[in-house]
Amino acid sequence: VLALIFAFSVPAQEAHAEEAYLNEDTTMKVTVTNMSPEYSISDVRPITTMFDCEIIMAFKMDEGLCMTFTTSCIGAAKVIGVKDIKVQQKMWYGWKTVLTSDGAESYDSAIFAADLKYADAIKDRTYRVICTHYADLDGYEEVVNDTGAFKFTY
């Protein structure tokens, strides 16, 4: 009797799938934050005043590779910013630097943001972005951020 009740009380499951078509207005955003594989949850972590150090990448058909760099700290830093920016394209022999920037900085601020575009990005090619976030709030700190590889499609 119990098996008969169970057989009738299970609702039917259905799944529907549909192919999404991308158009020129479609934008894919990729956010990468600085995370250290050196520390696990149970480990003691070093004291830091920086957080939300991000590289946001958007691939746009009419603009190329658009990037936003953000750096935040827990109080107003004497100086805060991003430096040593490299946009690299994957080649058969390794990574080729296709764009560099010295970066930018702000003073007496807790948040920094800057934009950068690489208009010559080629569809179906793989790119990565590397930079150094830094801040000086009771001592200078910096962290290197690497997006890893992302394929430019739209």
PLM regions and their residue ranges:
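Short beta-strand elements
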Residues: 139-154
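Extracellular and analogous surface-interaction loops
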Residues: 57-61, 118-123, 151-154
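Short, solvent-exposed, Trp/other aromatic-anchored flexible loops in extracytoplasmic proteins
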Residues: 104-139
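Short, surface-exposed binding/anchoring microloops in extracellular/periplasmic proteins
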Residues: 47-87
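Solvent-exposed serine/threonine-rich low-complexity stretches and specific carbohydrate-binding patches
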Residues: 84-85, 96-109
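Beta-strand elements of well-folded, non-transmembrane domains
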Residues: 73-75, 89-91, 120, 133-137, ...
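Hydrophobic residues positioned within well-ordered beta-strands of beta-sheet architectures
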Residues: 53, 67, 83-85, 114, ...
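N-terminal prepro-regions of secreted/extracellular proteins
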Residues: 1-60
